[in-house]
Amino acid sequence: MGKCRGLRTARKLRSHRRDHKWHDKQYKKAHLGTALKANPFGGASHAKGIVLEKVGVEAKQPNSAIRKCVRVQLIKNGKKITAFVPNDGCLNFIEENDEVLVAGFGRKGHAVGDIPGVRFKVVKVANVSLLALYKGKKERPRS
């Protein structure tokens, strides 16, 4: 049996389309609101947080490395997340209890590459860009 094709079937076609929209993954994610609730950022692109500890996350097979990450507690809602620290030696610019700005890490809420369970990356430390610190253009403010 196919779809209704006759005159006066607009209501049926419309209700059928409305019901079947919910089988589409993207539509369901956008309209249920549960994905937004589960997102630590609460729909925002960036969030500030306090560094709790530095952690090393082991890369997934077949790679063998310890990826440098930090545990961050977000200021806006108190949720704890793990954020990747990009570039070589940038973990040295970050200390515990620092305020960091964290952003998403690529794949729309999924982990990236060989780093399991890490969905965020550090962008700024103490209101100074991590990239500027890495390139030597700026220095960390003395506190």
Swiss-Prot record:
Ranges of biased composition (kind: Basic residues): 1-20
In terms of superkingdom, the source organism counts as Eukaryota
The yes or no answer to whether the keyword Acetylation is present is: yes
Q: Which residues are reported to carry the modification 3-hydroxyproline?
A: P62
Q: What would be the name of the gene that encodes this protein?
A: RPS23
Which Pfam families does the record associate with it? Ribosom_S12_S23
Q: Could you tell me which residues carry N6-acetyllysine?
A: K135
Described function = Component of the ribosome, a large ribonucleoprotein complex responsible for the synthesis of proteins in the cell. The small ribosomal subunit (SSU) binds messenger RNAs (mRNAs) and translates the encoded message by selecting cognate aminoacyl-transfer RNA (tRNA) molecules. The large subunit (LSU) contains the ribosomal catalytic site termed the peptidyl transferase center (PTC), which catalyzes the formation of peptide bonds, thereby polymerizing the amino acids delivered by tRNAs into a polypeptide chain.
Q: Where in the cell is it found?
A: Cytoplasm, Cytosol; Cytoplasm; Rough endoplasmic reticulum; Nucleus, Nucleolus
Post-translational modification as stated in the protein's UniProt record: Hydroxylation at Pro-62 affects translation termination efficiency.
Report what the protein is called: Small ribosomal subunit protein uS12
